[in-house]
Design a protein with these regions (language model features):
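Beta1/beta-strand and adjacent pyrophosphate-binding region of the FAD-binding site
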Residues: 2-17
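Core beta-strand elements of the Rossmann-like FAD/NAD(P) dinucleotide-binding domain
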Residues: 5-7, 99-109
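Structural motif
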Residues: 9, 31-33, 109-110
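Flexible, glycine-rich phosphate/dinucleotide-binding loops
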Residues: 18, 41, 53
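Gly/Ala-rich phosphate-binding loop of Rossmann-like dinucleotide-binding domains
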Residues: 22, 26
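Glycine-rich FAD pyrophosphate-binding loop
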Residues: 27-46
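N-terminal Rossmann-like dinucleotide/flavin-binding domain of flavoprotein oxidoreductases
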Residues: 45-104
Length: 111
């Protein structure tokens, strides 16, 4: 996806840390996009059973990743399914351009 207006926060990677960042950014009313090439949850999505996550006795990594995504999207974050191929920073505009398979995304900050 190519954006005309810069978003506030672009997050590269949809693992637990990426979605935690997306949740906090979205709660702060920042326009937020997570760019993930694989499955929600990142590497945790490949785990068959998660039994040590506080408050959740047992579920699969794929289910936990899906919950991360639903939580972030429920607060207004967007998710792009694409592989990031590069990131440029323009000192004049103070903006980042994230290049990925779906186009370019311009952002004020990148995590």
């Amino acid at each position: 996806m190519t954006t005309d207006q810069p978003i506030d926060v672009a997050i590269v990677g949809g693992g637990p840390a990426g979605y935690a960042a997306a949740i906090y950014a979205a709660r702060a009313n920042l326009t937020t996009t997570v760019i993930e090439q694989g499955m929600s949850g990142g590497q945790i999505a490949t785990t068959n059973e998660i039994e040590n996550y506080p408050g959740i006795p047992l579920l699969s990594g794929a289910e936990l990743g899906e919950r991360f995504q639903q939580h972030a999207e429920g607060l207004g974050a967007q998710v792009e399914w694409s592989m990031v191929t590069g990131i440029d920073y323009d000192t004049d505009s103070a903006l980042f351009t994230i290049h990925h398979d779906m186009g370019d995304t311009t952002a004020k900050s990148v995590i």
